[in-house]
UniProtKB/Swiss-Prot annotation:
<keyword id="KW-0812">Transmembrane</keyword>
<keyword id="KW-0012">Acyltransferase</keyword>
<dbReference type="InterPro" id="IPR042231">
    <property type="entry name" value="Cho/carn_acyl_trans_2"/>
</dbReference>
<feature type="binding site">
    <location>
        <begin position="555"/>
        <end position="567"/>
    </location>
    <ligand>
        <name>CoA</name>
    </ligand>
</feature>
<comment type="function">
    <text>Catalyzes the transfer of the acyl group of long-chain fatty acid-CoA conjugates onto carnitine, an essential step for the mitochondrial uptake of long-chain fatty acids and their subsequent beta-oxidation in the mitochondrion.</text>
</comment>
<dbReference type="InterPro" id="IPR000542">
    <property type="entry name" value="Carn_acyl_trans"/>
</dbReference>
<dbReference type="GO" id="GO:0006635">
    <property type="term" value="P:fatty acid beta-oxidation"/>
</dbReference>
<comment type="similarity">
    <text>Belongs to the carnitine/choline acetyltransferase family.</text>
</comment>
<keyword id="KW-0808">Transferase</keyword>
<comment type="pathway">
    <text>Lipid metabolism; fatty acid beta-oxidation.</text>
</comment>
<keyword id="KW-0813">Transport</keyword>
<feature type="topological domain" description="Mitochondrial intermembrane">
    <location>
        <begin position="74"/>
        <end position="102"/>
    </location>
</feature>
<dbReference type="InterPro" id="IPR039551">
    <property type="entry name" value="Cho/carn_acyl_trans"/>
</dbReference>
<protein>
    <recommendedName>
        <fullName>Carnitine O-palmitoyltransferase 1, muscle isoform</fullName>
        <ecNumber>2.3.1.21</ecNumber>
    </recommendedName>
</protein>
<dbReference type="GO" id="GO:0006631">
    <property type="term" value="P:fatty acid metabolic process"/>
</dbReference>
<dbReference type="GO" id="GO:0009637">
    <property type="term" value="P:response to blue light"/>
</dbReference>
<keyword id="KW-1133">Transmembrane helix</keyword>
Amino acid sequence: MAEAHQAVAFQFTVTPEGVDFRLSREALKHIYLSGINSWKKRLIRIKNGILRGVYPGSPTSWLVVASATAGSSYYNVDISMGLVNHIQRCLPERYGPYWTPQTRALLSMAVVSTGVWMIGIFFFRQTLKLLLSYHGWMFEMHGQSSRVTKVWAICVRLLSSRRPMLYSFQTSLPKLPVPSVPATIHRYLESVQHLLDDEEYSRKEMLAKEFQEKTAPRLQKYLVLKSWWATNYVSDWWEEYVYLRGRTPLMVNSNYYVMDLVLMRSTDVQAARLGNAVHAMIMYRRKLDREDIKPVMALGIVPMCSYQMERMFNTTRIPGKDTDTLQHLTDSRHVAVYHKGRFFKVWLYEGSRLLKPCELELQFQRILDDPSPPQPGEEKLAALTAGGRVEWAQARQAFFSSGKNKFALDAIERAAFFVALDEESHHYDPEDEASLSLYGKALLHGNCYNRWFDKSFTLIAFKNGQLGLNTEHAWADAPIIGHLWEFVLGTDTFHLGYTETGHCLGKPNPMLAPPQRLQWDIPEQCQAVIESSYQVAKALADDVELYCFQFLPFGKGLIKKCRTSPDAFVQIALQLAYFRDRGKFCLTYEASMTRMFREGRTETVRSCTRESTAFVQAMVEGRRVKADLQDLFRKAAQKHQNMYRLAMTGAGIDRHLFCLYVVSKYLGVSSPFLAEVLSEPWRLSTSQIAQFQIRMFDPNKYPNHLGAGGGFGPVADDGYGVSYMIAGENTIFFHVSSKFSSSETNAQRFGNHIRQALLDLADLFQVPKTDS
């Protein structure tokens, strides 16, 4: 492996003859090329900033306006209504030899044209923002758009017809509206009434009424005031108080995982698969830097906010005693790699050239072939990121703030992302039900010290070439990393490819400098902290029960025949499964996005509704005829869809109450109602996994090019975490988590209840399905 001094531009030694300087020509070359590359990126950002700033206008549209102004002047038609002549009179008559009347006239026309052009841009942008504030289309039946919606769609298409860059729509997106307090209180009480007995509900209703009349008006005024000047009245507080101020371990509690393709694998060569994946990720980062990614669009015309994508790469969560911070760099030219207890730094570029996949394969193979042992304290070092945040912050300050430890830690924290080369093999074997769950467990927590849980994401490569991600949650939500992952898997399969022997295509440069081994000096006191963090993390990991399975009888295709939303279908099945599992209902959390608003993140859909509980109880009792059950099911599905739409359009419950609670804390106002609401446990936390955000291939033509989604740990100690991906027309993947320490939960038992609930719903509509 490369010595540490290879990364240093110059060294000096003191001799009897004086100071002897030794320059490294190669290192200076890297510094020079890095500077050139940095300036290129700055120029690209400036150019993109200008193009983004004038959207939906363009430089071409300015030329059209300028040409029209000049042409009208040529034909003695003053379309400026005297403004050109007025500006011309205001300009000095003498200002050098080239300052002729013609120059003054051209300058005046340019000023007027630019002003008219910018006024037009402002008008079109505000019009587009107004149009994007219309959400009536979401509440209409599919295929039955009203005349208003059709006209609206035409107008949006006209105003956004020019090919947008990634952030072109950011300033045209509307702000997240603040709901009225009475509406939020009404929806909240409606969401819990069927879960409480009459006495408890009356008490809750009195608390809510007291809050609405006495405390809420003052809090609401401050919240509305914030919404006027802040880009988004929720997102900054959500990031800080829900994520960054959390003091419990990130592993299991916050981070989530994403799986690879599970029905196919292009190669079994670990270094080759990783070489293609890393190359594809840096290709994506380059497109991200250049804003050369099309924004995600609902219906193909409604843009989603792209703000969260900014911190995908070069980002690390830095621990603090009271609160963490997110450190984001504009660029990083290396990745940090962990293998067999050692840390390495792998450069992604040779000069200004991105390494080819085969060259990255060479670098990773060099690490795999390196026989050197870990240094004292190095093997389990990453357990610090898996344990308590306060302990990690104190250790970081005490042992990693100077010297070689700081240098090595900087190499990890300033990396584009983290890479873990695992010694285990994992894959999905349909004949072995446990294989998918073991794969998920490896991604969720590994052995508690082979993932750097603070990085924006860790790319994991198993010995057999299977990949996966472990993702930190504070910087963005799951659809963002999903967008990257779809690009990586599509690029790996359909663009980069492999040789017949499973290696990356092309020939590497054998003279590439080898990866740099990071050097540590970890004292025994620090090693004791590392071991303590490891024990905390191991106890947490050992307590997680994860059950992942592929539901084969049907997928989206059959659900559509039931004439209902696939998400509503699954959510009602989850309610039926939970009631059969626990004999009662509970508050249920489903994550919905608010990305139709600027800097929007998520909102909660309280999917255990009065309508869904009525249907479940009727199903369990078994006394109703099918027609009645179908009617109850459709009412429950319609209610769920309506709540989901309300959440997406800014009329949710929980983010509003959360922000009112934050305001109350700032003002020192006590609110028993808010304190009680925010302490209610979510014993069933669910999330649907987004897919096909990028159309890189036809899924019908390549049915095996299918990922299994991802999952997360349980939110409540006696609850379940459930994520699911409706993977095409014929299958659904589920990831169910719980804790062994709870006598009330069992992930596999609940998974079996989910299976049966789905089959029972299909039988209710008598839709043919395949064998399990």
